Amino acid sequence: MTTNDAPTNDADRWQYPTLAKPESDSFYSYHIQRRISTWFSVRLAGRMGANAATGLDLIFGVAAAVLVLLDHWLWGVVMIQLFGIFSCVDGEIARIQGRSSRIGDFLDTLTDRVVELLLVGAIAFSLRDRMEDPAALTAGFALLGGVFLLTTSSEKFRSAWQMGYPKRRLEKLFGLFCSGSDSRLLMLSIGLAVSDLTGDGLFLLWLLWALAAAAYVNFLVRIGLVYRHFRAGDPTKS
């Protein structure tokens, strides 16, 4: 099957939420981003492959980080949201075309991780320059540590149980603001917009600290949830 032969003619078949991932999508991704991304995916699936969409997603993400670093925060927010939408589009195109692949999943995951790293770093450095306060860097690195723990635990769960971590079902509260990259980037987008419009970087600084603290608590809770819900029937082994 070529890209142009992809089964996109039956538009009703691919209406929201057919292409969503209800177990692993966070609230924001499932209810907002997927509604928009499905519209793009149905129209692009006959014109590009999933890996090309991942490449476009990477461009949006890097552009967002550069804009934030150059102090264009509102434009950065726009690009962050485009990045979030196209983070859904690549996988949706793969499902529409019936061409899901391990390499595609690998590239998609790497793109998400790299872009979030760049964005948090760009926010921390840009905020430091605006406020002339090194605490912004400390808060940014604290958040990156929490992000590392959450993403590593998700990927290890997927490798151990051969399925995505069901954060939407098990972490409904954390899913609103920190358990997934989409919700974290939404919170950071709100922080960027509010701080840029008010001219007060203190809101964004405290948001970085709050997200960092929430991420560490989320990680500890996740350990308990995995132990509680998935330990049964697991043979004892090192």
Task: Describe these PLM feature segments.
Residues 52-103, 200-211:
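Membrane-embedded alpha-helical segments that form the functional core of polytopic membrane enzymes
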Residues 58-65, 81, 85, 117-120, ...:
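Hydrophobic alpha-helical transmembrane segments of multipass integral membrane proteins
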Residues 56-63, 112-123, 175-194:
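Core segments of transmembrane alpha-helices
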Residues 9-43, 84-106:
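Cytosolic-side membrane-entry/anchor segment at the start of a transmembrane helix
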Residues 78, 82, 91-138:
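Basic, amphipathic juxtamembrane/active-site segments
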Residues 1-36, 149, 153-238:
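C-terminal membrane-associated helical module and adjoining short loops/tails
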Residues 63-78, 118-142, 192-207:
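Helix-coil boundary and interhelical linker segments in multi-pass alpha-helical membrane proteins
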Residues 40-53, 106-111, 169-178:
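Short, amphipathic, aromatic/basic-enriched membrane-interface segments that mark the entry/exit
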